[in-house]
Structure formats: C-alpha cells, structure tokens
Amino acid sequence: MAQQTPLYEQHTLCGARMVDFHGWMMPLHYGSQIDEHHAVRTDAGMFDVSHMTIVDLHGSRTREFLRYLLANDVAKLTKSGKALYSGMLNASGGVIDDLIVYYFTEDFFRLVVNSATREKDLSWITQHAEPFGIEITVRDDLSMIAVQGPNAQAKAATLFNDAQRQAVEGMKPFFGVQAGDLFIATTGYTGEAGYEIALPNEKAADFWRALVEAGVKPCGLGARDTLRLEAGMNLYSQEMDETISPLAANMGWTIAWEPADRDFIGREALEAQREHGTEKLVGLVMTEKGVLRNELPVRFTDAQGNQHEGIITSGTFSPTLGYSIALARVPEGIGETAIVQIRNREMPVKVTKPVFVRNGKAVA
C-alpha cells in the first residue's frame, strides 16, 4: 500500500486528486493544474515534497567521503549553509541520482535525495560511507514544503518569528539555515525564487494551513512537472538514469574536473566519455498545433548530410509560453531545426538551449 505524507489529510481537505507516485500518495492537482502553474509564475504556490529523503551525515571524514562519492566537489562549500547540486554516479559514469548537499560544519553535511531512488541511494551511500566511519541518519521525522514564486518568500516570511526572519534576511540562492524548528533553504524546482522548508512532521499540517491562509496556493505534481520542464530542470529516470552519462544530460557543469588528482566514483569513465563524445540534451520548441511528448523520435540531418535520430525525454504544453516545449537527447551535430514524428505527421521544431523560462520570463 502506498505511503502517505503527514500532509495527506490537508491535501484531501484542499480537494486534491491523489495519485500513487513512486509508492507515495501525492496530489496530482487541486482542480486546475494550469491555475497552479500560473500561481507559481506570478504569485506563490506550494508543494508537499515530504516524499523526498533527507539524509544527515556526521563524522570527521564527511567532506573527504563526499569528495569521493559525488561528481561535484564539496571542497567548494566553505560557508556554513551553502549548498551545491551534484550527480552521484556509478563506476561506469551513469547517474544513480541527482541531489543537493548542504555543508554545516566539517563533521555535518546534509543530502536531499529523490523519493523514487531512496532505497538504492541509501544502500549506495551506506556501502561507500563505511570505510570513512560516517554516521548516517535518515530524517524521516521531517516533512518538507516547497514555497515557490515571486511572492513566495514574502508570504512565507509572515509565518516566521523574528529570529527566523533575521536568519533568512539577504540569504542568497542555494543556502540553507536551521532557524528554530525550521530548516529554510533557498532552493527549488520551478525556476522561481522561494524556499524549501523542512520541519517536524507533527508541525507540518499547521504550517501548511497557515500558508494557505497567507495566500499561498497548493500545487500538485502536474504543475511541478510543467514548471520544472519550463525551467529546464532534469527529472530522474527521464533525462538521466544509471545508463546515461551526466555529459548527455546537460549536467556537465556539475562535474568538478579540477583538481585533477581528486578521485571520485565514475571519474575514469567520464574522462573517456568526454574524450570520445556523448549525446547531448537540447531544448525543442514547436509553435504549431500539437504537443511534444516523451519518447517521440527527433530526426535531423547534420552539416555533412548524415541523418541522425534522438528522443524526447520530457515534453509538454508550456502554460507560460503558450506552445509546446521539450527536452531531447540527441547525437552531436544537430543544427537549429529538427523534425519530430507525431503519429503520422512530421512536425518541424526549433532547437534551443535546454531552458525555456526563468523568473516568469521567456529565455531568449
């Protein structure tokens, strides 16, 4: 039977349509996915992300361990609360998961990992942590609410006490701070400003209700997906998985190649892939009628006249832009246009960078 987050009852009270999402009963929408999407782009919306897994790591060798475990380098994290995004790779350079890591002290870091990959992530982390003497604590006692949108931080701050407001004042993106019962982070999955707030399970329902009263709109998985796709953010199992290199998933920027003597899991395989070349992730835009969908073929002819085929990894109608957008994994050599096969029609698409909307505005 699917698990329920501590906010399940709040979702039903708000009229949510609930679905099984990787073993969790989660809200798909609360009546209108489109309205929820626009609320985040223009005002403030919130998502229950309590199904994600928070993992606290303690030990004197935690930084050393994470420099080995992750493709990005936690040596960059020198200020308490600073976070970075990274892939956690296998030996062949495939992506086991993408995650966020927070640095607090030399012997205390925090990971936030995906729900669908929870068990394999915990197994992998535990296996590799043992030689480093790391103490692993899975924080199932915490719920998490993402409050996103141009007015999200201001509306959320009406629930904070003076000390919490002071703690987050002027906080830059990709930071987190523990302020009383709340862990407040300037992270998100929408391309908008906002907070992701972790708090004790028993306090989550009251906090959710207070956010509703503050004018923050409950949003479901449907809006979360269209928002992240507009923002060009990857979804695990679609843009990447254990067989796909981060170099083929627009995650090259998350690989810290320097210093050259840092050994991390998957490095040798990645260096070979970088030398020989991989597929790449691009954006597609179709302004004609129709919707670009996952797994549709993408065809193009390169400058030498050779024909190639790739695949759409995520596609949708963009509520913000008013036309269809997609992310696609394609061979090298793609130009400014391509063809997508939709049923029996060949539809022309424009090839773009894999990001479409940031802070409510179209990315040119």
From Swiss-Prot:
InterPro entries: GCS_T (IPR006223), GCS_T_bac (IPR022903), GCST_C (IPR013977), GCV_T_N (IPR006222), GcvT/YgfZ/DmdA (IPR028896), GcvT/YgfZ_C (IPR029043), TrmE/GcvT_dom1 (IPR027266). Its EC number is 2.1.2.10. One of its GO terms (biological process) is glycine decarboxylation via glycine cleavage system. Gene3D superfamilies: Aminomethyltransferase beta-barrel domains (3.30.70.1400), Aminomethyltransferase fragment (4.10.1250.10), Probable tRNA modification gtpase trme, domain 1 (3.30.1360.120). GO terms for cellular component: cytosol; glycine cleavage complex. One of its GO terms (molecular function) is transaminase activity. It is an enzyme of class 2 (transferase). The glycine cleavage system catalyzes the degradation of glycine. NCBIfam families: gcvT, PRK00389.1. Belongs to the GcvT family. This is Aminomethyltransferase. It comes from Escherichia coli O6:H1 (strain CFT073 / ATCC 700928 / UPEC).
